């Protein structure tokens, strides 16, 4: 909930994450000063799972133990628990996307988990690609659908892979000091040489780079960062000229 004066308890312009390894909770700001919090966790089979939160006492114990700072802000969480039913996350991966006069678009073709926030954008991209192909092929719908499916299917698959990968980042890696150092190095190098390095998140979220291309470039960047992280004393020399020059050599094939 909001503060008594209606202000936000924490930064309204940030995604807030409580990473816990196998699960996590996130919070996003609402316009009234409150936050919508979502708990992503296995339904069953884990030490911490939804099937174990089956009473007000178990809910309170869980949040007191696992998210004590959240519980301090929302001590009434158990009272609201049953008003927020569980739902499932799913991926739809299918082929072909077209048949006769029918074409799948948006979630019908490539529904994905929400951890990159790109589901709607991907649907709009489908529309843009299809619109351009309609202009290219005029009324030849067979050619339109054939090229649409051939062009978009790899991007739909890549977005799903990216979204799943980012779930692991959010629930686990963001609390890993080595991972955070990798991101600091990437950000520093990208600031110095924006044409040689665009972080994967920026490729996906803030550019028109195809998801399939971003996914492959992200893999190459990860391999480069594995090499950089092996530099002796990297935690103390991460922003040095030596490290930046090594990054420049390793990223010579990139041109953003």
Where are these regions (language model features)?
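Conserved FAD-binding catalytic core of PHBH/FMO-like flavoproteins
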Residues: 1-85, 93-94, 98
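Glycine-rich phosphate/pyrophosphate-binding beta-alpha loops
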Residues: 24, 89-93, 109-121, 154
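Hydrophobic/aromatic residues within well-ordered alpha-helical segments
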Residues: 31, 63, 126, 152-155
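A short, flexible beta-alpha/helix-coil linker loop
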Residues: 42-47, 110-111, 166
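FAD-binding beta-loop-beta segment adjacent to the flavin cofactor pocket
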Residues: 87-104, 157, 179
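Active-site flanking residues adjacent to catalytic metal/cofactor-binding acidic residues
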Residues: 105-107, 125
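A short alpha/beta connector and helix-capping loop motif
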Residues: 116-133
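C-terminal helical "tail/cap" subdomain of flavin- and related membrane-associated enzymes
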Residues: 132-256
């Amino acid at each position: 909930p909001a503060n008594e004066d209606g202000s936000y308890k924490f930064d309204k312009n940030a995604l807030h994450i409580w990473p816990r390894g196998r699960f996590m909770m996130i919070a996003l700001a609402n316009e009234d000063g409150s936050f919508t919090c979502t708990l992503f966790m296995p339904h069953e089979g884990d030490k911490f799972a939804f099937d174990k939160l089956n009473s007000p006492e178990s809910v309170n114990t869980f949040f007191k133990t696992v998210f004590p700072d959240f519980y301090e802000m929302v001590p009434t969480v158990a009272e609201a628990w049953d008003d927020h039913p569980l739902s499932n996350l799913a991926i739809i991966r299918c082929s072909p996307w077209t048949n006769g006069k029918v074409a799948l678009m948006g979630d019908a073709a490539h529904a994905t988990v929400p951890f990159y926030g790109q589901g709607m954008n991907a649907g709009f991209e489908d529309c843009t690609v299809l619109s351009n192909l309609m202009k290219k092929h005029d009324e030849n719908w067979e050619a339109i659908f054939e090229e649409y499916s051939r062009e978009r299917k790899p991007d739909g698959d890549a977005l799903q892979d990216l979204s799943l990968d980012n779930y692991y980042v959010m629930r686990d890696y963001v609390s890993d000091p080595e991972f955070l150092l990798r991101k600091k190095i990437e950000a520093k190098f990208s600031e110095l040489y924006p044409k040689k390095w665009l972080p994967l998140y920026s490729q996906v979220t803030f550019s028109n780079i195809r998801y399939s291309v971003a996914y492959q470039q992200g893999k190459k960047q990860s391999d480069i960062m594995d090499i950089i992280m092996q530099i002796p004393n990297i935690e103390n020399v991460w922003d040095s000229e030596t490290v930046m020059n090594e990054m420049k050599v390793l990223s010579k094939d990139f041109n953003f």
